[in-house]
Amino acid sequence: MYVIVDIQGQQMKVEQGRRLFVHHIKDVESGASVEFDKVLLVDNNGAIAVGSPLVEGAKVVCEVLTPLVKGDKVLIFHKKRRKGYRKLNGHRQQFTEILVKEVVA
């Protein structure tokens, strides 16, 4: 059984027991329980239920494993040819690691 759920603007295919990295969720602690109720599709062993836009009564219960994980550094390089202009910027995206405990459909 899997569901497609909208987590902070990203649609993810989720199954029970799966670990996910989602955009940083503020004000949560390790071990806290988080619910996501924007379920778009439910596949229960071949029986597919598609919401319009959401599936009624379906939700995903997750546990926060690591509240703040930083991703790899992304480098942004700007250059204007023949002018000697070069600029290097970068950032590290923040994520939250969660574990899917239960899928209620």
UniProtKB/Swiss-Prot annotation:
Keywords linked to the UniProt accession: Ribonucleoprotein, Ribosomal protein, RNA-binding, rRNA-binding
Gene Ontology MF terms: rRNA binding; structural constituent of ribosome
Taxonomic superkingdom: Bacteria
GO CC term, one of those recorded: cytoplasm
Single GO biological process annotation from the record: translation
One Pfam family from the record: Ribosomal_L21p
Endpoints of the signal sequence: none
Family: Belongs to the bacterial ribosomal protein bL21 family.
Function: This protein binds to 23S rRNA in the presence of protein L20.
PANTHER family for this protein: 50S RIBOSOMAL PROTEIN L21, LARGE RIBOSOMAL SUBUNIT PROTEIN BL21M
Summary of subunit composition and partner proteins: Part of the 50S ribosomal subunit. Contacts protein L20.
Protein known as: Large ribosomal subunit protein bL21
Taxonomic source organism: Porphyromonas gingivalis (strain ATCC 33277 / DSM 20709 / CIP 103683 / JCM 12257 / NCTC 11834 / 2561)
Name of the gene encoding the protein in the UniProt record: rplU
